[in-house]
Amino acid sequence: KEDADRFISYAAEENLEATVIADVNDSGRLVMTWRGDKIVDISRAFLNTNGASQRKDVYIAKPDEEGFFVRPEIKDIRAMWLEAMGDLNNASQQGLVERFDSTVGAGTVLMPFGGRYQKTPADGMAAKFPVRRGQTDSASFMAHGFGPDLAEWSPFHGAVYAVLLSVTRLVAMGADWRRAYLTLQEYFEKLTDRTSWGKPAAALLGAFHMQAALGLGAIGGKDSMSG
Protein backbone atom coordinates (compact mmCIF):
# COMPACT_ATOMS: atom_id res chain seq x y z
CA LYS A 1 0.00 0.00 0.00
CA GLU A 2 2.80 2.40 0.86
CA ASP A 3 4.36 1.76 -2.58
CA ALA A 4 1.19 2.47 -4.58
CA ASP A 5 2.09 6.02 -5.56
CA ARG A 6 5.57 4.98 -6.67
CA PHE A 7 4.17 2.08 -8.71
CA ILE A 8 1.65 4.39 -10.39
CA SER A 9 4.44 6.84 -11.27
CA TYR A 10 6.45 4.03 -12.88
CA ALA A 11 3.40 3.02 -14.92
CA ALA A 12 2.93 6.63 -16.05
CA GLU A 13 6.52 6.64 -17.36
CA GLU A 14 5.51 3.75 -19.64
CA ASN A 15 2.34 5.57 -20.73
CA LEU A 16 0.22 3.04 -18.85
CA GLU A 17 -2.79 3.80 -16.67
CA ALA A 18 -2.67 2.37 -13.14
CA THR A 19 -4.99 2.82 -10.19
CA VAL A 20 -5.57 1.29 -6.77
CA ILE A 21 -8.41 -1.21 -7.06
CA ALA A 22 -8.28 -3.02 -3.71
CA ASP A 23 -7.01 -2.94 -0.15
CA VAL A 24 -5.42 -6.09 1.28
CA ASN A 25 -6.41 -7.14 4.81
CA ASP A 26 -6.38 -10.26 6.98
CA SER A 27 -10.09 -11.10 6.71
CA GLY A 28 -9.41 -14.09 4.47
CA ARG A 29 -12.14 -13.07 2.04
CA LEU A 30 -12.40 -11.28 -1.29
CA VAL A 31 -15.11 -8.64 -1.15
CA MET A 32 -16.18 -6.51 -4.11
CA THR A 33 -18.68 -3.67 -3.99
CA TRP A 34 -20.52 -1.76 -6.69
CA ARG A 35 -22.25 1.51 -5.94
CA GLY A 36 -22.23 0.69 -2.27
CA ASP A 37 -23.68 -2.82 -2.65
CA LYS A 38 -21.65 -5.95 -1.90
CA ILE A 39 -21.66 -8.05 -5.08
CA VAL A 40 -18.86 -10.57 -4.34
CA ASP A 41 -17.87 -12.16 -1.02
CA ILE A 42 -15.85 -15.37 -1.39
CA SER A 43 -13.19 -17.15 0.64
CA ARG A 44 -9.53 -16.58 -0.12
CA ALA A 45 -8.97 -20.31 0.37
CA PHE A 46 -11.18 -20.94 -2.65
CA LEU A 47 -9.13 -18.53 -4.76
CA ASN A 48 -5.93 -20.25 -3.67
CA THR A 49 -7.03 -23.45 -5.39
CA ASN A 50 -6.64 -21.57 -8.71
CA GLY A 51 -9.13 -23.92 -10.35
CA ALA A 52 -8.32 -27.46 -11.39
CA SER A 53 -4.68 -28.43 -11.25
CA GLN A 54 -3.22 -29.13 -14.70
CA ARG A 55 0.04 -30.97 -15.30
CA LYS A 56 1.51 -32.54 -18.41
CA ASP A 57 4.48 -34.77 -19.06
CA VAL A 58 6.42 -33.60 -22.10
CA TYR A 59 9.05 -35.17 -24.29
CA ILE A 60 11.25 -32.76 -26.24
CA ALA A 61 12.62 -34.62 -29.22
CA LYS A 62 16.22 -33.97 -30.22
CA PRO A 63 16.39 -32.29 -33.64
CA ASP A 64 18.01 -34.14 -36.51
CA GLU A 65 21.76 -33.47 -36.51
CA GLU A 66 21.71 -33.43 -40.31
CA GLY A 67 19.34 -30.52 -40.20
CA PHE A 68 19.00 -26.80 -40.58
CA PHE A 69 22.55 -25.64 -39.85
CA VAL A 70 24.31 -28.22 -42.03
CA ARG A 71 25.37 -26.66 -45.31
CA PRO A 72 24.17 -28.72 -48.26
CA GLU A 73 26.60 -29.79 -50.93
CA ILE A 74 26.29 -27.51 -53.95
CA LYS A 75 26.02 -29.62 -57.07
CA ASP A 76 24.00 -27.34 -59.35
CA ILE A 77 24.01 -23.74 -58.16
CA ARG A 78 21.55 -22.65 -60.84
CA ALA A 79 19.00 -25.24 -59.77
CA MET A 80 19.46 -24.34 -56.10
CA TRP A 81 19.06 -20.64 -56.90
CA LEU A 82 15.85 -21.21 -58.83
CA GLU A 83 14.51 -23.44 -56.05
CA ALA A 84 15.22 -20.74 -53.47
CA MET A 85 13.59 -18.05 -55.60
CA GLY A 86 10.55 -20.27 -56.04
CA ASP A 87 10.08 -20.69 -52.30
CA LEU A 88 6.94 -18.97 -51.04
CA ASN A 89 8.92 -17.61 -48.11
CA ASN A 90 10.99 -15.56 -50.59
CA ALA A 91 8.10 -14.39 -52.73
CA SER A 92 7.22 -10.70 -52.97
CA GLN A 93 4.37 -9.61 -50.73
CA GLN A 94 3.95 -6.24 -52.42
CA GLY A 95 0.66 -7.19 -54.03
CA LEU A 96 -0.82 -8.12 -50.67
CA VAL A 97 0.60 -5.02 -48.95
CA GLU A 98 -0.87 -2.71 -51.58
CA ARG A 99 -4.36 -3.92 -50.71
CA PHE A 100 -4.02 -1.79 -47.57
CA ASP A 101 -3.61 1.99 -47.56
CA SER A 102 -0.25 2.58 -45.88
CA THR A 103 -0.57 6.36 -46.26
CA VAL A 104 -3.71 6.79 -44.18
CA GLY A 105 -1.82 7.32 -40.91
CA ALA A 106 -0.52 10.84 -40.31
CA GLY A 107 2.17 9.41 -38.04
CA THR A 108 3.62 6.96 -40.57
CA VAL A 109 7.42 7.20 -40.71
CA LEU A 110 8.42 4.24 -42.89
CA MET A 111 6.63 3.19 -46.04
CA PRO A 112 6.21 -0.57 -46.48
CA PHE A 113 8.66 -0.59 -49.41
CA GLY A 114 11.65 1.65 -50.05
CA GLY A 115 14.76 1.92 -52.15
CA ARG A 116 15.25 3.36 -55.62
CA TYR A 117 12.48 1.27 -57.14
CA GLN A 118 10.24 1.07 -54.07
CA LYS A 119 10.67 -2.70 -54.02
CA THR A 120 12.73 -3.28 -50.87
CA PRO A 121 10.52 -4.26 -47.90
CA ALA A 122 11.07 -2.33 -44.67
CA ASP A 123 12.47 -4.22 -41.70
CA GLY A 124 9.49 -3.21 -39.58
CA MET A 125 7.05 -0.45 -38.74
CA ALA A 126 7.79 3.02 -37.41
CA ALA A 127 5.16 5.59 -36.49
CA LYS A 128 5.10 8.84 -34.55
CA PHE A 129 3.27 8.96 -31.26
CA PRO A 130 -0.06 10.79 -31.39
CA VAL A 131 0.05 14.13 -29.57
CA ARG A 132 -2.81 16.45 -28.72
CA ARG A 133 -0.89 19.63 -29.53
CA GLY A 134 2.18 20.51 -31.54
CA GLN A 135 4.67 18.19 -33.19
CA THR A 136 6.79 15.30 -31.97
CA ASP A 137 9.91 13.58 -33.22
CA SER A 138 9.36 10.55 -30.97
CA ALA A 139 8.30 7.33 -32.64
CA SER A 140 7.60 3.70 -31.83
CA PHE A 141 9.08 0.76 -33.69
CA MET A 142 7.68 -2.71 -34.22
CA ALA A 143 9.26 -5.70 -35.92
CA HIS A 144 8.63 -9.42 -36.13
CA GLY A 145 10.71 -12.52 -36.61
CA PHE A 146 10.00 -16.13 -37.51
CA GLY A 147 11.75 -18.79 -39.57
CA PRO A 148 9.28 -21.51 -40.53
CA ASP A 149 11.89 -23.99 -41.76
CA LEU A 150 13.99 -23.52 -38.63
CA ALA A 151 10.97 -23.82 -36.33
CA GLU A 152 9.89 -27.01 -38.09
CA TRP A 153 13.35 -28.50 -37.53
CA SER A 154 13.50 -27.41 -33.88
CA PRO A 155 10.83 -25.37 -32.04
CA PHE A 156 13.48 -24.41 -29.46
CA HIS A 157 15.83 -22.93 -32.04
CA GLY A 158 12.87 -21.45 -33.91
CA ALA A 159 11.82 -19.49 -30.84
CA VAL A 160 15.40 -18.40 -30.06
CA TYR A 161 15.94 -17.00 -33.52
CA ALA A 162 12.44 -15.51 -33.74
CA VAL A 163 13.21 -13.30 -30.75
CA LEU A 164 16.73 -12.57 -32.00
CA LEU A 165 15.56 -11.73 -35.53
CA SER A 166 12.84 -9.36 -34.37
CA VAL A 167 15.26 -7.51 -32.07
CA THR A 168 17.90 -7.41 -34.83
CA ARG A 169 15.40 -5.76 -37.14
CA LEU A 170 14.73 -3.10 -34.52
CA VAL A 171 18.47 -2.41 -34.37
CA ALA A 172 18.62 -2.18 -38.17
CA MET A 173 15.88 0.47 -38.07
CA GLY A 174 17.80 2.52 -35.53
CA ALA A 175 15.76 1.68 -32.44
CA ASP A 176 17.22 1.14 -28.97
CA TRP A 177 16.72 -2.60 -28.49
CA ARG A 178 17.29 -2.31 -24.73
CA ARG A 179 13.92 -0.57 -24.43
CA ALA A 180 12.03 -3.18 -26.43
CA TYR A 181 9.25 -5.42 -25.16
CA LEU A 182 8.21 -8.72 -26.68
CA THR A 183 4.83 -10.15 -27.56
CA LEU A 184 4.64 -13.81 -28.58
CA GLN A 185 2.20 -15.62 -30.86
CA GLU A 186 1.82 -19.38 -30.94
CA TYR A 187 0.06 -21.92 -33.07
CA PHE A 188 0.61 -25.65 -32.67
CA GLU A 189 -0.93 -28.91 -33.72
CA LYS A 190 -3.49 -30.69 -31.54
CA LEU A 191 -1.71 -31.69 -28.34
CA THR A 192 -2.45 -35.35 -27.65
CA ASP A 193 0.71 -36.94 -26.23
CA ARG A 194 4.08 -36.22 -24.61
CA THR A 195 5.80 -35.63 -27.94
CA SER A 196 3.26 -33.13 -29.25
CA TRP A 197 3.27 -31.30 -25.91
CA GLY A 198 7.06 -31.16 -26.18
CA LYS A 199 6.88 -28.80 -29.16
CA PRO A 200 5.28 -25.80 -27.38
CA ALA A 201 7.35 -26.63 -24.29
CA ALA A 202 10.54 -26.42 -26.36
CA ALA A 203 9.38 -23.17 -27.97
CA LEU A 204 8.65 -21.63 -24.56
CA LEU A 205 12.09 -22.64 -23.31
CA GLY A 206 13.73 -21.18 -26.40
CA ALA A 207 11.88 -17.89 -26.11
CA PHE A 208 12.63 -17.62 -22.41
CA HIS A 209 16.29 -18.47 -23.00
CA MET A 210 16.65 -15.55 -25.41
CA GLN A 211 14.61 -13.22 -23.20
CA ALA A 212 16.98 -13.93 -20.31
CA ALA A 213 20.04 -13.48 -22.54
CA LEU A 214 18.83 -10.10 -23.82
CA GLY A 215 17.19 -8.95 -20.61
CA LEU A 216 13.87 -8.30 -22.35
CA GLY A 217 10.43 -9.25 -21.10
CA ALA A 218 7.20 -10.32 -22.77
CA ILE A 219 4.26 -8.16 -21.72
CA GLY A 220 1.41 -10.08 -23.26
CA GLY A 221 0.30 -11.18 -26.67
CA LYS A 222 -2.24 -13.10 -28.66
CA ASP A 223 -3.68 -16.35 -27.35
CA SER A 224 -1.82 -17.97 -24.49
CA MET A 225 1.92 -18.10 -24.99
CA SER A 226 3.16 -14.76 -23.66
CA GLY A 227 2.24 -15.66 -20.10
Model-based region annotation:
Residues 1-227:
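Glycine/proline-enriched, intrinsically flexible loops and inter-domain linkers
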